[in-house]
């Protein structure tokens, strides 16, 4: 079993890379891919860069060059659930674009043309993540809708507009749906795991800078615990 792991920023992958053994590095199109062993599994970890285009490029290269059995997207997100605190975790129950609108042609809000409205993570990856939750200590984790767009959300007016379109949204970020869409195209199982760095409000820019390292660590810890729970035979 080989698992691809994608984070957008250095703090989101640093703890994973530091914990790897037998690591080798290859750079393609300016993106570094680090292959090795983590939590007893063969993995390839990459820092994609921020946003949907960067994430799509990295995911496509990862799948084409390394043929992973599954892809995990790790990192930070803005929170939309009152019961979660900064540092807590959202495991994707589904992933959607929040900044796509082709409703004029009969699609749902957030649904890209000729794509599903929601990208559904692999059941065996979500199951492994839920088993890992018990080992998180004081960090809380839930399953929920994660939405993606090419904007850092810190405007309460925009937040309310997003919640009107996606009332069950638990977190928003800038890469997950793009990664999920590429995985869907290639038929590769995926899951998105995000730790909250802010609460998508006026304080978000300050909170993000203050808590990105904490969020990156918690999300990386969740990924490593998930890897330990994965059954090597549970692929595709």
From Swiss-Prot:
Keyword Electron transport recorded: no
Active site per the UniProt annotation: 12, 198
List of residues binding substrate: 78, 153, 174-175
CDD domains: MTAN
GO molecular function, one term: methylthioadenosine nucleosidase activity
GO CC term, one of those recorded: cytosol
Record field: catalytic activity: S-adenosyl-L-homocysteine + H2O = S-(5-deoxy-D-ribos-5-yl)-L-homocysteine + adenine; S-methyl-5'-thioadenosine + H2O = 5-(methylsulfanyl)-D-ribose + adenine; 5'-deoxyadenosine + H2O = 5-deoxy-D-ribose + adenine
Pfam families assigned to the protein according to its UniProt record, in alphabetical order: PNP_UDP_1
Database matches in Gene3D superfamilies: Nucleoside phosphorylase domain (3.40.50.1580)
Pathway(s) this gene product operates in, as recorded in its UniProt entry: Amino-acid biosynthesis; L-methionine biosynthesis via salvage pathway; S-methyl-5-thio-alpha-D-ribose 1-phosphate from S-methyl-5'-thioadenosine (hydrolase route): step 1/2
Recorded family membership: Belongs to the PNP/UDP phosphorylase family. MtnN subfamily.
Protein name as it appears in the record: 5'-methylthioadenosine/S-adenosylhomocysteine nucleosidase
Species of origin: Shewanella baltica (strain OS195)
Gene designation: mtnN
């Amino acid at each position: 079993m080989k698992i691809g792991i994608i984070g957008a920023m250095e703090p989101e992958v640093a703890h994973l890379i530091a914990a790897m053994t037998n690591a080798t590095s290859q750079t393609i199109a300016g993106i570094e891919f680090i292959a090795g062993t983590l939590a007893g599994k063969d993995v390839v970890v990459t820092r994609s860069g921020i946003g949907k285009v960067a994430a799509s490029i990295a995911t496509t290269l990862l799948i084409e060059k390394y043929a992973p059995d599954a892809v995990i997207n790790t990192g930070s997100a803005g929170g939309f659930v009152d019961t979660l605190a900064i540092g807590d975790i959202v495991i994707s129950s589904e992933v959607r674009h929040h900044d796509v609108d082709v409703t004029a042609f009969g699609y749902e809000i957030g649904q890209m043309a000729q794509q599903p409205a929601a990208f559904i993570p692999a059941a065996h990856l979500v199951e492994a993540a839920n088993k890992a939750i018990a080992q998180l200590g004081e960090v809380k984790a839930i399953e929920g809708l994660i939405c993606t767009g090419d904007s850092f959300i810190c405007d309460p007016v925009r937040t309310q507009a997003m919640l009107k379109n996606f009332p069950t949204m638990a977190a928003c970020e800038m890469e997950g749906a793009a990664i999920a869409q590429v995985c869907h195209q290639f038929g590769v199982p995926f899951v998105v795991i995000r730790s909250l760095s802010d609460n998508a409000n006026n304080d978000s820019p300050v909170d993000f800078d203050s808590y990105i390292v904490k969020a990156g660590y918690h999300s990386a810890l969740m990924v490593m615990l998930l890897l330990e729970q994965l059954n090597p035979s549970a692929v595709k």
